[in-house]
């Protein structure tokens, strides 16, 4: 404190006149602790505690004492410095101590009923009882609940209490507790408060309960001992003292102005920022309450501060270094990823365009196109999803490991799904036949070394992986097939193609490795989402590589996208994409199969159900892989052959390319041909469907397979049905996959519907096309039906028509068909080729019956055959057209047509590939006549003219086309070359019948892919036209017409071609014109799907197709009437 002299000096100048007593009083106030008789000390004492915490910032307070308070005039004014005030804290502490010492509690000295049963038992006796009591904390008050027996409506409850052993007592009225009546009892509450005079240790509070009712008064006094509470001093004072000591640590910091408190808060924030709490926590100072001087406390705080600062700086430096390193690594990896890889995972790499641009800049697109770069944030999750990213994957520890594009492997079997191993994805480097040269960024040098592995597309790899997972045998087969394909591919393809395949293989490997079922599903969605990206990538790659094949490979890698893009690519000007599209019908199917297969494993189930043969199942996948390879090959071939035609009829070209490429692959590998046989039936048709509808090709493919089988069977069925044709009933079999693609084949059901006699009455086979939409596929069943539509050519034949040997199918015996099936089963390649090339009706019947046996039952073969014929629902005027076509076919010699078809096929085939021509030549035996002879020979029914064979081919055309696409492609190159001209006329005839081939080139294109050497030109043409109509309705007519072309080209003979050339040309022009709206509509559908929603686009597309089909049917009917 300041000495008293200061106020005394001030008083002389500033104080009013005061008696001498005032000075002494003032001094006493300063020296002594503010005597109690003065009112100021109490105020000052009360304010002192506040001043300590609240008034400390102020410079000082002015206190005024008035003389009138002492009975005098105003005496003096004193000023006190704030630092003097803390002396009053002693009184505050004393006050708190006194307050705590005065706390009392009431403790009960009785026991309440422990259970409700006891309570009710006593209540029945005493009529009123104390149910519960509650002592309010911090005060000497009690709240109790009394339960009374409801003996009367009017009742009063009192609590009589005494504090002096009943010398005196008080009655307290208890209040009714609302909503406490349970019909038998009521509750009343009361409250007893012990006021301070009675708050002393040892005081007793006794009470009893009086229950007054109309019946009487009842008492409850705890069985004569009264309810007693005793007042006890609260002994828990030390406990609050401990927390008080702990709390003051903070308070004292504030009082002492410990600067470290702010620093500590900053330290904690820094800890949060740097995530290193352990280090900083150890340095948090603990201030112990003590009587140290301010200076000591400040010094200690400063020391703590310094230590914290040093430690924090050190931690900051370390953290900064760590963060910088991490950022550098992530940036470098991200940049490499962006440069080198294209993010197929939408989550991982939002800027796909950047990846594409960087790829284009660095020329690394070739191998790295489908490698995905992971953003640092996606790290482990994205890496897990991608199984392996060609570039470093980000593990949970932010360690990035780039998987070089070497992962692209020729051997799918070596592909390792590295889903779970994000950090070990580096190990998932696929072994390629030739090693890629990696640049500094672990990216394959664009020009250094190209992987010469014609690896299947990512879908193929996916199929391979699926085969690995779900088909041990299929896996090996795929690998073998890939090896064969690779050999063919290398031999056939140029270095650029190798690069493209390399690129595709890297993509495929990338997908294959990373694609487990989940990933495949993911890519399926991703690819759909990234269709634009893939298209752009493909175009860019084509620009860079100069090889549309590369784009094809890219598309192969994005098969699922292609599945969606197939139609788009058909519209896309790039030939490579077109080639992709051309091969994509199957490859897309296979891709989608691979994509869907991981989801549903439907390839295996599909293949097993369809072919019932693992070989075929494997081939379905391997076929897909092979198809992808074929696609690459086809891309090469189509690069030269299809370049002109692709723009015109991309879908037909696609089918042709697929067939051609598949033919090569089969030619390369017999096993592949065997697998492809089943696959071709399913997958080729599937590919067609895929072309029509890229999204859900597998189910449609399955449908197509069955339909194809049905079509083949239809020729068989025609044999039986023709006999029954007089009955005037035709059967329409509609195959539908009821559910997911995985069990499509198994679930495919043939719906056999009797056609009205009106439909069956025609002398010509009535071709009823069913335009159905596959709810599961989200596509028109037409797409796959169209594949079978050719088969549906003449389902119902009158006996006369059957007599005409043109319906060789009708004449074909089921036994022969079964034999052929057996042959095809045992010798799938040869038999298949025969069937496709010229095995004639029996072969097609074989295939149909065989396929049916595989897919369905032999018993249902006839029905399926019949049904498949009408499968294309487009009844429209097609039946009439069929009649006309049949008439045309009758007019034309199927033998001649077959010759021309074989000639055109063989002539055109060389363009495609020698292997195809060889195989086809073997199958077709030789030139047109030889092919016809072979057909007759193969067709045990030699008596039946080639027209029958051609008709059978027409019926089985879809099957064969689907099947031939694999087997024929081998044999077709030559045949196609032969039939380039003949097929054109044949296809024209067929188109006159219904399919109307475009030009020899167009028919050759299709014949190259699915050329069916033996086809009934007339019936095929009829079927083709009807089927084309159905296809037009389903939007698949282009592709089916391609198949039909091949079929008809195989079956039609030159004389017939000449006779029907003009009619075919007119029909072709009409057909082309009729298909243009569908193509445009499909493009609109793709655009709508991209910009809006799949369901919206699909609905619009379906409605538009239905309307167009209806209009076209009306037009045809009007023409027929004329």
From Swiss-Prot:
Residue span, CBM21 domain: 122-230
Pfam families (UniProt xref): CBM_21 (PF03370)
Cysteine pairs bridged by disulfides in the record: none
Mode of membrane association: Single-pass membrane protein
Organism domain of life: Eukaryota
SUBUNIT field: Interacts with PPP1CC catalytic subunit of PP1, and associates with glycogen.
UniProt feature, compositional bias: Polar residues: 640-662, 1031-1040, 1048-1058
Biased composition (Basic and acidic residues): 395-405, 499-516, 963-977
Stated role: Seems to act as a glycogen-targeting subunit for PP1. PP1 is essential for cell division, and participates in the regulation of glycogen metabolism, muscle contractility and protein synthesis. Plays an important role in glycogen synthesis but is not essential for insulin activation of glycogen synthase.
GO cellular component, one term: membrane
Keyword terms: Carbohydrate metabolism, Diabetes mellitus, Disease variant, Glycogen metabolism, Membrane, Phosphoprotein, Transmembrane, Transmembrane helix
Region span, Disordered: 32-58, 332-351, 395-422, 496-516, 640-668, 963-983, 1025-1058
Origin species: Homo sapiens (Human)
Residue positions where Phosphothreonine is found in the record: 56
Tissues expressing the protein: Skeletal muscle and heart.
Post-translational modification note: Phosphorylation at Ser-46 by ISPK stimulates the dephosphorylation of glycogen synthase and phosphorylase kinase.
TM spans (from-to): 1078-1098
This protein's name: Protein phosphatase 1 regulatory subunit 3A
Entry domain remark: The CBM21 domain is known to be involved in the localization to glycogen and is characteristic of some regulatory subunit of phosphatase complexes.
Subcellular location as annotated: Membrane
Pathology linked to this chain's protein: Type 2 diabetes mellitus: A multifactorial disorder of glucose homeostasis caused by a lack of sensitivity to insulin. Affected individuals usually have an obese body habitus and manifestations of a metabolic syndrome characterized by diabetes, insulin resistance, hypertension and hypertriglyceridemia. The disease results in long-term complications that affect the eyes, kidneys, nerves, and blood vessels.
Gene behind the chain: PPP1R3A
């Amino acid at each position: 404190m300041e000495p008293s002299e200061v106020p005394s000096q001030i008083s002389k100048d500033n104080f009013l006149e005061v008696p001498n007593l005032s000075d002494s009083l003032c001094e006493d106030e300063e020296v002594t602790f503010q005597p109690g008789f003065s009112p100021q000390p109490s105020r000052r004492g009360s304010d002192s505690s506040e001043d300590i915490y609240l008034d400390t910032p102020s410079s000082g307070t002015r206190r005024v004492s008035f003389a009138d308070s002492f009975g005098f005039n105003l005496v003096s004014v004193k000023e006190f410095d704030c630092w003097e005030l803390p002396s009053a804290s002693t009184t505050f502490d004393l006050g708190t101590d006194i307050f705590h010492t005065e706390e009392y509690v009431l403790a009960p000295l009785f026991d309440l009923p422990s259970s409700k049963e006891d309570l009710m038992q006593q209540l029945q006796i005493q009529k009123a009882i104390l149910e519960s009591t509650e002592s309010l904390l911090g005060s000497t008050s009690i709240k109790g609940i009394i339960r009374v027996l409801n003996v009367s409506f009017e009742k009063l409850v009192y609590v009589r209490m005494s504090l002096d052993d009943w010398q005196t007592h008080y009655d307290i009225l208890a209040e009714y507790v609302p909503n406490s009546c349970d019909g038998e009892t009521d509750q009343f509450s009361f409250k007893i408060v012990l006021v301070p005079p009675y708050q002393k240790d040892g005081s007793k509070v006794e009470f009893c309960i009086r229950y007054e009712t109309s019946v009487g008064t009842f008492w409850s006094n705890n069985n004569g001992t009264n309810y007693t509470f005793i007042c006890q001093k609260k002994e828990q004072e030390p406990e609050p003292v401990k927390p008080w000591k702990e709390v003051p640590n903070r308070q004292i910091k504030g009082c002492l102005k410990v600067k470290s408190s702010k620093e500590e808060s900053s330290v904690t924030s820094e800890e949060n920022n740097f995530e290193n709490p352990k280090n900083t926590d150890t340095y948090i100072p603990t201030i112990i309450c003590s009587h140290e001087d301010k200076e000591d406390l400040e010094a200690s705080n400063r020391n703590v501060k310094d230590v914290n600062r040093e430690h924090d700086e050190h931690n900051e430096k370390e953290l900064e270094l760590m963060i910088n390193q991490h950022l550098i690594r992530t940036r470098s990896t991200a940049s490499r990823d962006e440069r080198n890889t294209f993010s197929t995972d939408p989550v991982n790499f939002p800027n796909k365009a950047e990846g594409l641009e960087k790829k284009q800049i660095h020329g690394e697109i070739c191998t790295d196109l489908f490698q995905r770069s992971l953003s640092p944030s996606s790290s482990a999750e994205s890496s897990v999803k991608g199984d392996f990213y060609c570039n470093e994957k980000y593990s949970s520890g932010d360690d990035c490991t780039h998987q070089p594009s070497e992962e692209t492997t020729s051997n799918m079997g070596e592909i390792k799904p590295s889903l779970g191993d994000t950090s070990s994805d580096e190990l998932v480097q696929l072994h390629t036949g030739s090693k890629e040269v990696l640049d500094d960024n672990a990216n394959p040098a664009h020009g250094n070394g190209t992987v010469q592995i014609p690896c299947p597309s990512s879908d193929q790899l996916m199929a391979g992986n699926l085969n690995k997972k779900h088909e041990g045998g299929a896996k090996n087969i795929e690998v073998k097939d890939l090896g064969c394909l690779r050999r063919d591919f290398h031999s056939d393809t140029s270095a650029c193609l190798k690069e493209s395949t390399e690129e595709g293989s890297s993509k495929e490997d990338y997908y294959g490795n990373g694609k487990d079922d989940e990933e495949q599903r993911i890519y399926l969605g991703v690819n759909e989402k990234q269709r634009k990206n893939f298209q752009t990538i493909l175009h860019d790659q084509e620009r860079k590589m100069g090889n549309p094949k590369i784009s094809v490979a890219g598309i192969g890698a994005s098969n699922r996208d292609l599945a969606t893009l197939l139609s788009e690519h058909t519209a896309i000007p790039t030939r490579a994409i077109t080639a992709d599209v051309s091969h994509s019908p199957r490859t897309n199917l296979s891709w989608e199969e691979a994509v869907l297969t991981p989801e549903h494993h439907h390839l295996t189930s599909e293949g097993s159900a369809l072919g019932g043969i693992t070989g075929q199942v494997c081939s379905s996948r391997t076929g897909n892989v092979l198809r992808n390879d074929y696609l690459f090959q086809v891309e090469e071939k189509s690069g030269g052959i299809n370049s002109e035609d692709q723009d015109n009829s991309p879908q037909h070209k696609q089918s042709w390319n697929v067939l051609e490429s598949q033919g090569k692959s089969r030619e390369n590998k017999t096993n592949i041909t065997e697998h492809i046989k089943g696959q071709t039936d399913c997958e080729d048709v599937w590919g067609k469907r895929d072309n029509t509808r890229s999204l859900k090709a597998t189910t449609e493919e399955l449908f197509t397979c069955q339909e194809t089988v049905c079509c083949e069977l239809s020729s068989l069925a025609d044999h039986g049905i023709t006999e029954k044709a007089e009955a005037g009933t035709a059967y329409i079999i509609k195959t539908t996959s009821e559910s997911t693609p995985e069990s499509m084949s198994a679930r495919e059901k043939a719906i056999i519907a009797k056609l009205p006699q009106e439909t069956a009455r025609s002398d010509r086979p009535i071709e009823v096309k069913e335009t159905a939409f596959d709810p599961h596929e989200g596509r028109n069943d037409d797409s796959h039906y169209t594949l079978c539509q050719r088969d549906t050519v003449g389902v119902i034949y009158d006996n006369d028509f059957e007599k005409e040997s043109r319906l060789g199918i009708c004449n074909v015996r089921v036994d022969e068909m079964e034999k052929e099936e057996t042959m095809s089963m045992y010798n799938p390649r040869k038999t298949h080729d025969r069937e496709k090339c010229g095995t004639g009706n029996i072969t097609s019947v074989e295939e149909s019956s065989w396929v049916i046996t595989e897919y369905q039952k032999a018993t249902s073969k006839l029905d399926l055959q019949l049904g498949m014929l009408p499968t294309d629902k487009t009844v429209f005027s097609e039946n009439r057209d069929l009649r006309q076509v049949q008439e045309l076919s009758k007019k034309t010699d199927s033998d001649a047509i077959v010759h021309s078809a074989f000639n055109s096929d063989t002539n055109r085939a060389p363009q495609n590939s020698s292997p195809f021509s060889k195989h086809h030549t073997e199958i077709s035996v030789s030139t047109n006549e030889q092919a016809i002879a072979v057909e007759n020979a193969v067709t045990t029914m030699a008596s039946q003219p080639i027209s029958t064979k051609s008709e059978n081919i027409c019926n089985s055309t879809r099957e064969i086309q689907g099947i031939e696409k694999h087997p024929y492609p081998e044999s077709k190159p030559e045949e196609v070359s032969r039939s380039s001209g003949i097929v054109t006329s044949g296809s024209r005839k067929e188109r006159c019948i219904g399919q109307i081939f475009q030009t020899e080139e167009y028919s050759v294109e299709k014949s190259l892919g699915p050329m069916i050497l033996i086809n009934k030109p007339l019936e095929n043409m009829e079927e083709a036209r009807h089927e084309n109509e159905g296809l037009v309705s389903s939007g698949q007519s282009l592709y089916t017409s391609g198949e039909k072309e091949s079929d008809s080209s195989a079956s039609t003979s030159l004389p017939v071609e000449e006779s029907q050339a003009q009619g075919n040309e007119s029909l072709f022009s009409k057909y082309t014109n009729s298909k243009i709206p569908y193509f445009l509509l499909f493009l609109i559908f793709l655009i709508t799907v991209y910009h809006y929603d799949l369901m919206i686009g699909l609905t619009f597309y379906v409605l538009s197709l239905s309307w167009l089909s209806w209009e076209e049917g009306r037009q045809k009917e009007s023409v027929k009437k004329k």
